[in-house]
Amino acid sequence: QTITASVGVTYDENQLDTLINGLECMQADQQVEPVNAHPEYDGNSYVVKAGETGSKIDTENFKKVVKESIEGFKSEIDMTAEDCYVEPKYTIESEEVKKACDDMNKYLKASITYNFGSNTEVVDKDLISQWVTVDDNMAVTFNSDAVVKYVQQLESKYDTYQTKRTFTTGGGNSATVEGGDYGWIIDEAAEIAALEANIRNGETVTREANYSQTAASHDGADWGNTYVEV
């Protein structure tokens, strides 16, 4: 006849929970939050940056493992092997992260070169990468406000409407005039729409800005080489 006996372990669960909660590894200042894998710009494109497990304890599972170890007379716990740490939501294998990278890289295909006379301004991946973001749920967003600010910077730099102009009079003296209705004016609304469309469509183009009013030249005096002194 075979007799099977089980060895039981009894303990006060409340006291055990108190002991577990008092462990150094359970203290908030000893725990580091896990970091999700995420898209990261490497200077050429967005690639998947590996996340980190950190040291944040999965409290429920940790207590379960401790109790099982006591009941099994185990003196040590491999916390990594026993999945006692909170894992990142996204890893390098997560399809959501891969898709986010692909979506962000679509914007980086664009390259827009503006001609302003002998000057050029370029909107390419290095700049566009600053206008594309991804949130904690791997949703990609293009920052349209950044396009608005960029076009406004172009206006500040290249618009000449109602600016002061200095020229040499017929008598050889220097004179300055201001006001009037002459000069370059970038059509802000049209240019914002055009630039954003270029970027969203991943286009490579060389072009002039959209203007609501033009002048003779971007280089030097915007009236060119001819004027009438009144």
Across the structure, where does each feature detected by a protein language model lie?
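Surface-exposed, secretory/extracytoplasmic low-complexity segments enriched in Ser/Thr/Asn/Gly/Pro
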Residues: Q1-V230
